[in-house]
């Protein structure tokens, strides 16, 4: 009559390392090999890069663009970028808009309350160079002499896409440990 053909099945008791097409398997040995080849600092930086919690200082028109960035259309949560209201829970400070001499001590105090490691993003022409208020008696110029700016996002105001790109650049700096933020 007919011949009975043997069919090969993936029985985990026979060969647990056998690959099944379309199925991703992780074995303990693969995890151990990954950990042996990876430095602990690289794993820590991977976690830091994928969980940036930022505190905003919305001054001027850049604050409106920051609010737009937080809407569902841009979905910054997919990058691990989450806003925080407390400086003690944030590791990124976004300085946006102009900084006045009266506001500077409060901004420094918020910076001091943030735990290390911490990073700073300067968003908008006003934060970077003073913008149209450059020659004003009350505007602080050269904010990068006061705070260690890691990423500059130019524009007046920069679009939400530019802010997201700035976060991606910061993530790459953290991954490569080329950020000039505070010590670890």
UniProtKB/Swiss-Prot annotation:
It holds the Pfam family Oxidored_q6. Residues 1-20 are annotated as: Disordered. It is found in: Cell inner membrane. It comes from the Archaea. InterPro entries: NADH_UbQ_OxRdtase-like_20kDa, NADH_UQ_OxRdtase_20Kd_su. NCBIfam families: nuoB_fam (TIGR01957), PRK06411.1 (NF005012). Belongs to the complex I 20 kDa subunit family. This is F(420)H(2) dehydrogenase subunit B. The lineage of its organism: Archaea, Methanobacteriati, Methanobacteriota, Stenosarchaea group, Methanomicrobia. The gene is fpoB.
């Amino acid at each position: 009559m007919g011949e009975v053909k043997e069919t090969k099945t993936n029985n985990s008791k026979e060969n647990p390392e056998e690959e099944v097409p379309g199925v991703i398997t992780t074995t303990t040995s693969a995890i151990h090999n990954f950990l042996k080849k990876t430095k602990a600092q690289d794993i820590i930086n991977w976690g830091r890069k994928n969980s940036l919690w930022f505190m905003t200082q919305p001054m001027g028109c850049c604050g409106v663009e920051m609010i737009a960035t937080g809407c569902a259309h841009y979905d910054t949560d997919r990058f691990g970028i989450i806003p925080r209201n407390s400086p003690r829970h944030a590791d990124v400070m976004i300085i946006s808009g102009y900084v006045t001499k009266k506001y500077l001590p409060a901004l420094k105090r918020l910076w001091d309350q943030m735990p290390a490691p911490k990073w700073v993003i300067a968003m908008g022409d006003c934060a970077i160079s003073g913008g149209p208020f450059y020659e004003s008696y009350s505007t602080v110029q050269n904010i990068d002499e006061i705070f260690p700016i890691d990423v500059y996002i130019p524009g007046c105001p920069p679009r939400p896409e530019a802010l997201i790109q700035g976060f991606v650049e910061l993530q790459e700096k953290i991954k490569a440990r080329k950020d000039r933020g505070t010590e670890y």
